[in-house]
Structures are given as C-alpha cells and as structure tokens.
Amino acid sequence: MTVADTAPGPATDRRGPRRVLVTLCITQITSWGVLYYAFPVLAGQISADTGWSVPILAAAFSAGLVVSALLGIVVGRWLDRHGPRWLMTLGSVVAVVAVLGLAGAPTIGWFAVAWVAAGTAMSAVLYPPAFAALTRWYGPRRVGALTILTLAGGLASTIFAPITAVLAGPLGWRGTYLVLAAVLAVVTVPGHLLGLNQKWPPAQHVTQERHRPDQVLRSRSFLALVAAFALAACASYAVVLNLVPLLHQKGVTYEVAAVALGLGGAGQVLGRLGYGWLSRSLRVRARTCLTLAGVAVTTALLAMFTGVAALITLAVLAGMVRGILTLVHATAVTDRWGASHYGQLTGVLSAPVTLAAAMAPWIGAVLAAVLGSYSTMFWVMAGMAAVAAALGLATVPAGCADSADVVTAQPAQ
C-alpha cells in the first residue's frame, strides 16, 4: 500500500499553521540567540572575570548540549502524542531560569549546573520540536515551512552575537545574561503559550503509514541513517569551528579568515533557499548521498587549495552544503517512514548527531595537534564525510517509494 501525508485537517486551516510558523520563527531566533550564540561571545569575558579557563567553560557548555541530545528522545515521544504547546512553553520557562542561573553562578560548579538546566530547555525549544510541530501541522507542505524556519534560525547569530557584544561592554557578562533572560521571558514564554494554541492533528490524520517505531529503530536503514548523519555532523562542525585556524595556517590573515567564516554563514542561507528545488528534483537516496558527498568534497578542497579567493569561495560552498544538510536531516524521517512518529524517531536520530556536533570542535583540534596541521585534519574529516555518503546509500528502507512525499508501508529493513 502506498501512503502519503495528507493536508492538515479542518481543525488546522491555513491561517493556524501560518501563525504557528511565524511564532516559531521568532522564538527560534530568540532561543538560539540566547541559549547558543551568546556564549561564544561572552566566554572570553567570563574567563577573564572569574578565572575559570575557557576549556572548562566550553566543557560546561558541551555538557548542556549532551543533556539536550539525550532528553530529545523523550521529548520527541511526548510531543508526538501531545503536541508542542505546553512542552515548548515549559521549556522556555526552564530556559529563563537557566540563564538567570548562569548570570548568578558563584562557582564553576553552579555554572555547569546552569548549563545542564539550559540543555534541558534546549531539548524542548530548539529545532527538533519545532521541526516536529511544522511537519505535523503542514503535512505535504512541510518543506516550504521548514525552509522558512531554518532561514529565520540562521539569523540568530546575525542578530544576537552583536547585541550580546554591545551589552557586554557596559553591563558585563552577568548583566548581559540578565538582559537576555528577560528577552527570553518576554518573547518565548508567551510566544509558545499563545502562538502554538492550535489543535494538534491526530497522527492518523497526517499519515496512514504502519511502521512501528520499535521496528524502525532496529532497522538497518535507520541505523545507517544515524551513523551517516553523525559522521557528517562531526565533519561539518569540525570544519566550521576550525576554518579560521586552517586559513591562518595557509597564510590568510585572521581578519580575512573571519570574513570567510561569515560568508560561510551566508552560504547556509543560499543552500536552504535551494532545498525546495532539490527535494522536487532528486529522490531521497540521491539527495541524501549528494549532500553528504558535498560535505566530503568541500572539506577536501579546503584542505587542498591555498589561494585566498579559492578558499573563500569554498567556505561559501561548504556553508551551502551545511544549509542543505540541515533540511535533509529535518525531512529524513518523514521522507522514509511518514510523519506519525516523527518526534520520537527524529529525537533518536538527533541524539548522536548532536553529540557528534558537540564533540567536533575538540576532535578537530586534537587531530590537528596530533597530525601536525589543520590541512591534514581536514583530509581526515573529508574521509569521514565520504564514509557518511557511502552509508547514505543504505538509508532508504525497502518498500520506500524513494520520493519526497510518498512512503510505501512495508516492514522496516
């Protein structure tokens, strides 16, 4: 039997999902900006003020990401059944408390505990639950909605990094976190409470697929998908966070390297804008493998080339691939197994991916030190991404129609 996602039912006309999308765009910008992008801006000042080393601070931040990844599995299962409104509202409240905890932390231990609380909030307010909400409410129109959401999310660093830097001057890092906590409280708590007040469509109204989650989780195709995305996440995040030292080692000034990094962010926006065309033009397996191969190729070329213009161009191309990869990840479950258990399956899929992304900066730095150069480390990352692309061939289950919106209900393989 061939099954497809149907359009949202009568309980959720187009105005309802549109309001949800606008709400999530605003709250994602705010949540990412405060919970993720403010820390790199403030880390140096925190270290100088407290004497806590930057590596220790980074470890506390990474601990929050690990907690977010692990809790995402439980969050996804709950969201499938009950919807995102109360989950994301409570997550926003926890986020406010966590940021207040960061602002007032008297010791590094308390600072780490506050990041664990922030990680708990991240699991409930960042991309995975937002993706699940839009996938259920938008049905076959999900790709456009997800693209808009990730384009908005991409503005978080553009907006909040400079705001954080401006606030940190007169207010210090503690005062800055107090202001950011207030922003979270004013924007995200009422935003999720009021903006997500829509009837949650029952799973059977969204898809008629019969894949049991336990079958899918044990299937070869799902395990291959997890491995492929985790390897690609490790490679791509290692590239992002080690791009500046790579370029500097090749003779590029820090100022130009920073520009290249920023243009890579612009590349992500271009990649996301093009995903709708890609999803209509290529089947699931083809676009998965092509995107993962793109990570490998751009990483290898960054290791190979030395000219400034070529390196900047490659940084933009690598950013485009990362932008596409975000949406390939967001639609991976629905493209293969339908939308009924999207939250649970994506939660399990995202956990190792988030862990890999959290470890990537450390892995990249250690490899560069052991191997003696960032170029050699980039070659290793390119090889890792190539393995991910090869695994991509095995990520589509038997019986899947291998198209964007149609999934054939067969036992998971």
Question: Where on the chain are the PLM-derived regions?
Answer:
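Helix-loop-helix hairpin linking two adjacent transmembrane segments in secondary transporters
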Residues: 149-197
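Extracytoplasmic
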Residues: 19-54, 72-75, 161, 239-244, ...
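Conserved MFS/SLC helix-loop-helix module at the cytosolic interface between two early adjacent transmembrane helices
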Residues: 70-108
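Cytoplasmic helix-loop-helix junction between adjacent transmembrane helices
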Residues: 115-151, 332, 338
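Interfacial helix-cap and linker-helix signal at transmembrane-aqueous boundaries
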Residues: 46-47, 78-79, 162-171, 247-248, ...
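Extracytoplasmic gate region of multi-pass secondary transporters
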Residues: 39-43, 220-273
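C-terminal transmembrane helical hairpin of 12-TM major facilitator-type secondary transporters
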Residues: 264-268, 281-332
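Hydrophobic core of transmembrane alpha-helices in multi-pass small-molecule transporters
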Residues: 29, 98, 109-125, 230, ...
